[in-house]
Amino acid sequence: MEVNHQNECVPYNCLKNPKIEMLDIEGISSRSREQVAEISLGLTRFLLESLLPGASFGFGLFDIIWGVIGPDQWSLFLTQIEQLIDQRIEAHVRNQAISRLEGLGDSYEVYIESLREWEASPNNESLQQDVRNRFSNTDNALITAIPILREQGFEIPLLTVYVQAANLHLSLLRDAVYFGQRWGLDTATVNNHYNRLINLINTYSDHCAQWFNRGLDNFGVVTARYLDFQREVTISVLDIVALFPNYDIRTYPIQTLSQLTREIYTSPVAEPGASLNVDLRNILREPHLMDFLTRLVIYTGVQGGIYHWAGHEISSRTTGNLSSNIQFPLYGTSANADRPFNLAIHYSETIYRTLSAPIYSVSGGISPNRTRAVEGVRFLTARDNNLNSLPFLYRKEGSLDSFTELPPEDENEPPYIGYSHRLCHARFARSSVVLEPSNFARIPVFSWTHRSAGPTNEVSSSRITQIPWVKAHTLDSGAFVIKGPGFTGGDILTRPNLGTLGALRVTLTGQLPQTYNIRIRYASIANRGGTLIFSQPPSYGLTFPKTMDIDEPLTSRSFARTTLFTPITFTQAQAELNLTIQQGVYIDRIEFIPVNATFEAEYDLERAQEAVNALFTSSNQLGLKTDLTDYHIDQVSNLVDCLSDEFCIDEKRELSEKVKHAKRLSDERNLLQDSNFRGINRQPDRGWRGSTDITIQGGNDVFKENYVTLPGTFDECYPTYLYQKIDESKLKAYTRYQLRGYIEDSQDLEIYLIRYNAKHETVNVPGTGSLWPLSVESPIGKCGEPNRCVPQLEWNSNLDCSCRDGEKCAHHSHHFSLDIDVGCTDLNEDLGVWVIFKIKTQDGHARLGNLEFLEEKPLLGEALARVKRAEKKWRDKRETLQLETNIVYKEAKESVDALFANSQYNRLQADTNIAMIHAADKRVHRIREAYLPELSVIPGVNAGIFEELEGRIFTAFSLYDARNVIKNSDFNNGLSCWNVKGHVDIEEQNNHRSVLVVPEWEAEVSQKVHVCPGRGYILRVTAYKEGYGEGCVTIHEIEDHTDELKFRNCEEDEVYPNNTRTCNAYPADQEGYEGACTSRNRGYDEVYGNTPSLPADYAPIYEENAYTDGRRGNPCESSRGYGDYTPLPAGYETKELEYFPETDTVWPRNRYSVD
């Protein structure tokens, strides 16, 4: 370390001790701007340290601002930005602003005096009345004055006085909330003042941030004045605004430790008044994790005999990580006119001040060479223990003092104690090479951070601690630091997808163990979930309810706080935290609220009150907020249930009634019947319908009320299902509706909303099944109910779900939602909306509850036009379907009627065979929309006529089976009922048909059949002969009366006289069914596709896929009696003979390959 012991103490004329380092500021230009900075930094320090409940804060605010600043000082505030932006404030605007500020100061002084008197005698009703009057007077004065301080056209130059008035107003309202009831105000009035306070925090913050950013944008490019504006207005406006949220006395009821992580720049280190002639566009750093300077290496060059700062290298570390080392690239050049100057900074040291020696040299004649450079800098350091540290000297000390632009925050302390900023980085500007040496410039630019953001994240045991997440020590892959909106005191973090932000290391300062409630300040474009990952297991689930729209800019109103349901107990002095978030979530900071019995009860009450009030659209509780789910209301109810009876029994009862009212409102707007799952299949036409394996279970540690469990299934044709229809009478025309609910866990859960078409999502939500691991017994209450009030191991209630390949994931959280648009309503048609949950895999499962179907919003603009187009398209296709149905129904009915001998459908025609029945069944199944393709138990538009004809087909099968005297004729039951000689096989072919194979000439199967002598019978056989020779099917009686059917490989097919065909005539692709499930008569599936009345070249006149419009056909429709008619292999033929038995017993016998 290079040390120059000469001139170690620099004069600073505001200090009484001449031995203490001092600064001569008498000759400094822009005095007004420096004074504004001093006042603003003093106010910021006061807000950081003294924003405590009670009257002392108001007294202090009066003492440092409103009791000491007069017209001259207010004029300095106005002059500051006038100089920065080169815009003069018109005289009448200036005079009006100053007069208003004076009036506010006078009114506030009277209020403060009455507050002092009341505090001395708080039970004096006269003093209570007086302080109420003084409060109202000052409040009204502020309401009138603040619009004048944002005069149109002068918003930017008025910012510094606007923020002072805004700060005063928030302080005044905070007093009313804190003291209101003791002043004699009723609860409603106090709550009204609180609501005004919260609203004005957002209003004032947004105004200041908006016009600050507008002011920066007006510069266009980065210049020296740009840096001055960024620095000075940050100090005089944004730093104060960043602390506005702490005025929320109910959220921050005790002293709060805040930090300002923003980074500002002092002016380029150059001789005052000299033109820079350098490009400053690369001076600003990109958003980054907060870092702390650990090493500065300065390289020295020489130009025209002047040794100067030619370039430098910087190393830094992140917060709380001594081992981290961020090495930045070389700035400038690594010149070697002198040995490098190496400045190594201990982790306990801070560079709080620089004294630079810039030089502006002009040499030569008519075309002189101009040199702008820095000959030396003294870096003054302080230690964390408030001790002065030896300075670092690079070559020489100069008179350009950083305190001119960044004065101390406390002038009553030595500068190494009262300083306001620490040096964190330096960049470098240089002249263009093409202009050198006539214009030569080498100029460093220093950047600084506020001293409130220290190098460690210490958590207090007695105060609320706010730690911006930009103070993490690592930035995880995929996470980004983005520029803060202006009112957060620094930059913020986000991610474009699900993942972690980065590890934040905290240090506990109190005696261990320490318990804290944890809050996160965030903004979110949708209802999202996240996980707080803790180095002392387990992890904790978080919800991030929507605070803004997707295209909305970040404003103060966009930010909210979310709280862990249970406190965290820290048992170690250091802890690592990380946060898992989803896309569209922006993280500002984490907050630690210390817990003790009394404070915890008060905190829980405040949190419950805030949560209950947030349920409603207004204070009169007439309506619920649309985006608040039924599940959320249950969680708020749990919050109220867990309030302490000892500390707040009356408040608990009042809040409980409000939550019950909210629950009733939630039930009223929910169009689903039996949303609490009192039963399934209880009423034929109402409520929930479902498969018999669904169970209803009472509330657990996830659900407060009943929920349903859907298991997996072994056959996708028989899925687990749950459905309900929303009646047309409940729907409004041209309105969007939303289905939503909560899924504890699921695998392969399909969700459908069906009207004109089907909206379909498959949701996989990992879950533990319980909040409690197997080794831990879930806490229960005295009656066996889940105890939701004990400290719990939390899981992620909004965990990202995983999607099956090729399927779109419905949601990224346990909260799911799906919307559907309704066009014109027609009570006669009663189209309604079908709500379906389905699982069709063996591994599938789901637990879900708090289901809601509710009106979301009227359709406007493009959404309205889109639903009208969809409705017209649906109606056009429905009309086409009706025409096609009429044709198909007529043909199907004719085929069915032809099977029977009479109109009572109780006797078959004598020549009706199994092929004819299957052919008729085929035609019946060409009737589309008999059932919903999404779930075949739900009737479709053509269910009536389909079931009419299908019932007659079933009758035909029954009659046919009843008149067939051969048992097990289709070999579906193997060789049951058959006598076997030799070796035979039963094979199941790929079309699920059982086939008898007789492989050897000596093998045969036979069956004794009882018949009625004198009656005629038909023996009909379908068979195929392999190889040479012949196979026989014989029928004989005991008297050896024998007939036979012979099958030869070389003979041509014999055809039944009335055009009976083998099923080769009907390929399956003509039918439009592609399912794998067979019909109930498996032995006849695909065997008899022939019918005497169906022409071989028949094809449908419509195309089914053209109608579905994204809705797939039901692959399991054949489970209702019709299979996938795959053609038989070539060579099979059907033969028959008539037989008239003379006895009551005959023997059919098969030889060789016979079916």
UniProtKB/Swiss-Prot annotation:
Q: Which Pfam families match?
A: Cry1Ac_D5, Cry1Ac_dom-VII, Endotoxin_C, Endotoxin_C2, Endotoxin_M, Endotoxin_N
Q: Write out the entry's keywords from A to Z.
A: Sporulation, Toxin, Virulence
SUPFAM superfamilies linked? delta-Endotoxin (insectocide), middle domain (SSF51096), delta-Endotoxin (insectocide), N-terminal domain (SSF56849), Galactose-binding domain-like (SSF49785)
Q: Which residues form the signal peptide?
A: none
**InterPro entries per UniProt:** Cry1Ac-like_dom-VII, Cry_V, Galactose-bd-like_sf, Pest_crys, Pest_crys_Cry1Aa_dom-IV, Pest_crys_dom-III, Pest_crys_dom_I, Pest_crys_N_sf
The GO molecular function terms of this record are: signaling receptor binding; toxin activity
Gene Ontology biological process terms, A to Z? sporulation resulting in formation of a cellular spore; symbiont-mediated killing of host cell
Its UniProt miscellaneous note says:
Toxic segment of the protein is located in the N-terminus.
Q: Family, per the entry? A: Belongs to the delta endotoxin family.
Q: Name the job this protein performs.
A: Promotes colloidosmotic lysis by binding to the midgut epithelial cells of insects.
Protein name per Swiss-Prot or TrEMBL: Pesticidal crystal protein Cry1Hb
Q: Which organism is it from?
A: Bacillus thuringiensis subsp. morrisoni
Q: Which gene encodes it?
A: cry1Hb
